[in-house]
Amino acid sequence: IVELKDSKKEKLSYNQVLFGSIVNLKSSGQIPENITMRQAVATVLDEIGNKNVQTVQIGNSIFVGTFTPEKNNMYVRVYNMDVGRNLIDNMYNYAAFLQKKGVAFVSAYIEDERLLPGLRVLQRRLEKKGTGLDVVELETGDGFGMFIKFGKQSLRKAA
């Protein structure tokens, strides 16, 4: 396992975040045992290379956003090597970035239920600015769907 790093004290490079988070996903069982580390890295690099994909690093988190056929909708995946409290700030700042770019809706798959308390904090911060965040348990029982619908009020002004 690669240790998370507080981005306020130590900023990791893009590659350090990406590879560290893949190592952690693999060691925590979130990447199946029959997938080698090399295959996992190749799959991620292939995804990032797609022309519909935009990657943004904020702190020690990398957000991989894929535009859906409706151009103002995005599906997002996070590769994280930052500590919990910073991850929530990074997510808020990424949401503000997407809102400014004209994205209206964001969805993400959340596998790790340890993120739920942090998502509730993020939800309260977004709702103060008129942006909705919902998390629903998937019927399959193997995770959660997170959905953000941006409001009119800018998230950029301090929340």
Regions found by a protein language model. Give the residues of each.
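Short secondary-structure junctions
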Residues: 3, 52-53, 127-139
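Extended low-polarity, hydrophobic cluster-rich segments
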Residues: 18-22, 41, 65-67, 91-97, ...
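Short amphipathic alpha-helix that is part of the acyltransferase structural core
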Residues: 1-43, 158
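Acyl-donor binding region in acyl/amide transferases
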Residues: 70-131, 140-141
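Conserved donor-binding loop and adjoining core beta-sheet/short helix segment
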Residues: 50-84, 152
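C-terminal "cap" of GNAT-fold acetyltransferases
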Residues: 134-159
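Short loop/turn motifs at secondary-structure junctions and domain boundaries
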Residues: 45-49
